[in-house]
Each structure stands twice: as structure tokens, then as C-alpha cells.
């Protein structure tokens, strides 16, 4: 019958396990973050398709708005949340789409940019987004109304403005600012201006 493990043997096994974890953990965390980015991009793509469908069915200008200002009551919203709303032809907020609530990106994932050209990927200026004015939600915003970035679909199903490239990637909102991480490895959601078609890609 084999004797019990000695203290030295147990310590050796634990040491080996710690070394293996130290080697594999960074790779595991990187893989997990990458999966979160891909998941967020697909969720946004699906939501954009639903918003477009609502616009066509109800014959109303309908937008997916992202919180891109700092006039908020909680830091959980900027660059990490989105919601469907109805706007008019001048991009002015009218009301929230019935039964729609704020939805959030996976932890550690944000919308890094909305560009209107592939050359403008990830500049962080949101130049390809529509500015939706008079957005109102007393439970979210500290101001009575705000202006936020979004994608607007006309009642015909095509997009207000030029093609839009939504850049989803790693990042966080801290100390009143959006901090982007690993910008070379982002997921792209493309919305075609003329057809409203939503497609995916990577930078």
C-alpha cells in the first residue's frame, strides 16, 4: 500500500499548478474578451435588424441610440448601453419604442466609434453616426434632454446619412472618459446606406 503524499510532494504539485495557471490565464482572458466583443457585435447587428423592421412595419423613423454623452446618473451607461427609439425626420427624439428597455454590452466591451468610411475606423469621433437630439430619460440622464449618437432607419428601411461602420471593442468608461483598449482587434458592424443591410467584419 502506497504511503500518503509527503508535504514536499504536495507543495511541488501546488507549485506546478500555479505555474500552469500563470502561463495560461492571460491567454484565457484574452480569448474571453475576444468572445465578448464578437458577441456584442452580433447582438448589435440583430438589434439593428429589429429596429429596421420596426421602422418599415410602423412607417416611422426609428433609431438605435447609444449613450455617448457624460450627462448621466450612472457610469454604467456611456458607450455601454443602447435602446430603440422613435424620431422625426429631423432626428429629434419622439418616444421610446414600446416594450424596449436599455440593453448593455458585455463587461469590458464598449462601442468605440461609428464611422462613415473604412478609412475612419476607430477614430473615436463618431462622425458616421446620426446625432439624435432631445433624448429624454429621467432615470438615466442628469440633464432634461441630451444629444446622443445612433443609427436611424427611415420608414423605407434605408439609413439616414451615409454608410455606417460601428466599431465594437474592448474598453471602459472611467473618470468621465471613454478608454479604448486593444483597438487593433475590434469587431465591425456595417450598415449599408441604400439597402439598410447589416453585415459583420473585423478590423
Predicted regions, residues:
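Alpha-helical hydrophobic helix detector
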Residues: 11-27
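Carboxylate/His-rich catalytic cores and anion/metal-binding grooves
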Residues: 8
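Positively charged n-region of N-terminal signal peptides that target proteins for export
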Residues: 1-3
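N-terminal helix-rich module
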Residues: 5, 23-49, 53, 61, ...
Amino acid at each position: 500500500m502506497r504511503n500518503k503524499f509527503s508535504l514536499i510532494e504536495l507543495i511541488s504539485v501546488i507549485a506546478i499548478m500555479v505555474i500552469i495557471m500563470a502561463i495560461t490565464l492571460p491567454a484565457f482572458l484574452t480569448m474571453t474578451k475576444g468572445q465578448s466583443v464578437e458577441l456584442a457585435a452580433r447582438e448589435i447587428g440583430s438589434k439593428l435588424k429589429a429596429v429596421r423592421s420596426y421602422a418599415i412595419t410602423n412607417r416611422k423613423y426609428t433609431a438605435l441610440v447609444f449613450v455617448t454623452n457624460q450627462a448621466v446618473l450612472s457610469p454604467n451607461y456611456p458607450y455601454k448601453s443602447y435602446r430603440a427609439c422613435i424620431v422625426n425626420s429631423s432626428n429629434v427624439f419622439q418616444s421610446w419604442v414600446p416594450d424596449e428597455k436599455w440593453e448593455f454590452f458585455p463587461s469590458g466591451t464598449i462601442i468605440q466609434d461609428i464611422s462613415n468610411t473604412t478609412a475612419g475606423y476607430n477614430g473615436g469621433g463618431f462622425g458616421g453616426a446620426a446625432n439624435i437630439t432631445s433624448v429624454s430619460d429621467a432615470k438615466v440622464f442628469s440633464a432634461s434632454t441630451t444629444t446622443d449618437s445612433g443609427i436611424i432607419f427611415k420608414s423605407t428601411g434605408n439609413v439616414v446619412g451615409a454608410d455606417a461602420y460601428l466599431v465594437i471593442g474592448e474598453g471602459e468608461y472611467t473618470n468621465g472618459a471613454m478608454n479604448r483598449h486593444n483597438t487593433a482587434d475590434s469587431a465591425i458592424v456595417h450598415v449599408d446606406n441604400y439597402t439598410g443591410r447589416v453585415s459583420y467584419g473585423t478590423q
